[in-house]
Amino acid sequence: MATSRNDDVLIIGGGHNGLVCAAYLAATGLKVRVLERRHLVGGAAVTEEFHPGFRNSVASYTVSLLNPKVIRDLRLHEHGLRVVERPYANFLPLPDGRSF
């Protein structure tokens, strides 16, 4: 990765909070660089496979804490935000095919 001394702000961590911060700062005209150690950004908002064939966001239950102002300001629906209501809070698949 090339280094640059032209950044106004360096944000360590590309989790959802770091990305929101970066978006607001960039909107003011600042040059922002975000560094993330993982191969993808999003932090707790990332959807990952926790069991073969089963994908979930590890912190999807916190979506209710997402400030509506942030959703509007960043036009998240225009960028693919879709909140899906689940009929159950938890799901546990069992090795014998049953679940609860």
Say what each PLM segment does.
Residues 3-100:
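N-terminal glycine-rich phosphate/pyrophosphate-binding loop and immediately adjacent elements
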